Swiss-Prot record:
Keyword Cell membrane annotated: no
The protein's name in its UniProt record: RNA-binding protein 48
Keyword Membrane appears in the UniProt entry: no
Region feature (Disordered): 220-249, 343-371
Gene Ontology biological process terms in this record: mRNA processing; RNA splicing
InterPro entries: RBD_domain_sf (IPR035979), RBM48 (IPR039599), RBM48_RRM (IPR034264)
Biological role: As a component of the minor spliceosome, involved in the splicing of U12-type introns in pre-mRNAs.
Alphabetically ordered keywords of this record: mRNA processing, mRNA splicing, RNA-binding, Spliceosome
One GO location term (cellular component): spliceosomal complex
Subunit structure: Component of the minor spliceosome. Within this complex, interacts with ARMC7 and PRPF8/PRP8.
């Protein structure tokens, strides 16, 4: 940047305060009248030049005022810099560039000890390493911001819909290893190619009820498969299938063995897992009460059989390891502490074993108020 008189101590062009813009629209004017000036990363700097400071020895107060906007690395007075009479010029270097931006915005044209401050950037005081670091930080910031914008743009893209039901079924079977991959052609030319024929697509049973671990045999139950598929197309059979789906999985397994052509079919999944089953409020309360009673009976059974030699369900908790302290007195003290801890833990009061009805009746009922 060229200077006005060509000397290093002269006033640079970017140090001169620009006049207020008078052609700005009314709706764009802020609270304070400002000039039109564009700052690039090359013009911004951690160094701030403060002009118009009254020469009353208020450097400490000035630094404290600027320290409100960020950490200051160094500061000094510029005696050789040309200034007005009875004023001084100071140079302050901030640790972060963002702190210098905020300080310049807040402290420019502010009153300080009767004088009007003029704050501007001073990039000519930067070293080559500081300028390189500033440019690298700016590049990293730009790449991070553009990457986030690209991420949000790609996130808002609509997902393409599936064209056909057959394609979706093929994708479903391809991603689910537990299902047999059915053949599209029900009458293959080479039976050796399709070594594991399972349910054809013409069968209208829900696919979520069938799962297999081992491949199905090729020549088994071919006649039964066609009969079951033809019978499953009728709505009456589907309605009967829905009615039987409420039974336990063991009964479902017996009914599917006669209709499914695969020899190795696991137990069918209950319909209540796939479709939500309506249950009245009273039934839900009764079911909860029954489960609480079962849990209570199981707990009392385990408590009564602790002394016996029966195997308990669940892993055994590890005991407190005994540590040898290599001293008789210390070992005696440690044993006393362990025994005391066992007494404290065993003396915890147990909850009452009575039924919930007895507990409810133990509390006195509130008398009904008569009007």
């Amino acid at each position: 940047m060229a200077s006005s008189d060509g000397k290093p101590g002269g006033i640079f062009d970017h140090h001169v305060q620009t006049a207020v813009c008078d052609s700005r629209a009314k709706y764009r004017e802020g609270r304070r009248p400002r000039a039109v000036k564009v700052y690039t990363i090359n013009l911004e700097s951690q160094y701030l030049l403060i002009q118009g400071v009254p020469a009353v020895g208020a450097m400490k107060e000035l630094v404290e005022r600027f320290a409100l906007y960020g950490a200051i690395e160094q500061y000094n007075a510029l005696d050789e810099y040309p200034a007005e009479d009875f004023t001084e010029v100071y140079l302050i270097k901030f640790v972060k560039l963002q702190s210098a931006r905020i300080a310049k915005k807040k402290m420019d044209e502010q009153s300080f000890f009767g004088g009007l401050l003029h704050v501007c950037y001073a990039p000519e005081f930067e070293t080559v390493e500081e300028t390189r670091k500033k440019l690298e930080e700016r590049k990293a910031y730009i790449s991070r911001v553009t990457k986030n914008q690209d991420y949000y743009v790609t996130k808002k893209k609509p997902v393409p819909e599936q064209k056909g039901t057959k394609d979706s079924r093929q994708d479903f079977h391809a991603h689910m290893p537990g299902f047999c991959t059915p053949a599209l052609n029900t009458s293959p030319k080479n039976p050796s190619e399709n070594s594991s024929p399972c349910l054809p697509y013409s069968c209208e049973f829900p696919l979520c009820y069938f799962a297999s671990k081992s491949p199905c045999s090729p020549g088994e139950h071919t006649d039964k498969a066609s009969d079951s598929c033809n019978s499953a197309r009728n709505r009456g059979e589907l309605q009967k299938h829905r009615d039987h789906s409420a039974f336990p999985p063991k009964l479902q397994m017996n009914t599917y063995k006669t209709s499914v052509p695969c020899s190795s079919v696991q137990e069918a999944i209950a319909t209540s897992q796939a479709v939500g089953r309506f249950m009245p409020r009273t039934t839900q309360l009764q079911e909860r009460k029954r489960r609480r009673d079962c849990d209570r009976e199981l707990g009392t059974f385990l408590e009564t059989n602790i002394s016996s030699n029966e195997v308990l369900i669940g892993p055994k908790l590890p005991g407190i390891p005994t540590v040898d302290l290599q001293d008789d007195s210390l070992n005696t003290t440690a044993n006393l502490i362990r025994s005391k801890l066992k007494e404290v833990t065993s003396s915890v009061p147990k909850p009452p074993e009575d039924n919930g009805e007895d507990v409810c009746t133990s509390h006195p009922r509130k008398q009904r108020r008569r009007i």
